[in-house]
Design a protein with these regions (language model features):
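Short secondary-structure junction motifs
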Residues: 21-23, 73-75, 118, 146
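Short acidic/polar alpha-helix capping motifs at helix-coil junctions
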Residues: 29-30, 74-75, 85
Length: 156
């Protein structure tokens, strides 16, 4: 409805500088509003740990959107994604599912710490199996864009 369109405009305005610097991408579609965070910007390399110095402002803005606007009663799904590259055999994640799940959970935990209602939240891992449509995942840029965590604010 119209509430989602208004909230989308608020989100675009709120994240103007991050969008300009390609740190955040915002879309709206039939599922809802998607705030896409680049893993390369917000997570330490080959890690599920958020670089909180870099991520704090963005997470605070997301929590503001999810607590202080008409989106406060919406269900939110934190979706972890990876590229199709293999995980480090010596690393802590057996598969990309594990890495994406842990990243999504870490974002969820911070948002709850920043005041988002935990009853509205869920974390999901897609591993490498939901690449961005029409994006070549064989290029370095394509792989980088697929390494992301999407904060999906669901339509009713």
């Amino acid at each position: 409805g119209r509430g989602m369109a208004k909230a989308y405009k608020q989100a675009v305005s709120l994240f103007e500088s991050e969008i300009k610097n390609r740190k955040v991408k915002i879309d709206i579609n039939e599922r809802g509003i998607i705030i896409s965070l680049s893993n390369d910007v917000y997570f330490k390399r080959a890690s599920s740990d958020l670089d909180i110095d870099t991520a704090r402002t963005v997470l605070e803005k997301i929590s503001l959107l999810l607590t202080k606007t008409e989106l406060s009663d919406k269900q939110v799904r934190i979706e972890g994604h990876t590229d199709k590259g293999p995980t480090d055999p010596d690393g802590p994640w057996e598969t990309n599912w594990d890495l994406a799940a842990e990243r999504a959970l870490n974002v969820l935990k911070y948002l709850i710490d920043f005041g988002v209602n935990p009853a509205n939240m869920a974390a999901v891992s897609y591993g490498e199996y939901q690449p961005i449509p029409l994006l070549n995942d064989d290029t370095e840029e394509g792989m980088a864009r697929n390494r992301r965590v999407d904060v999906l604010i669901l339509r009713d």
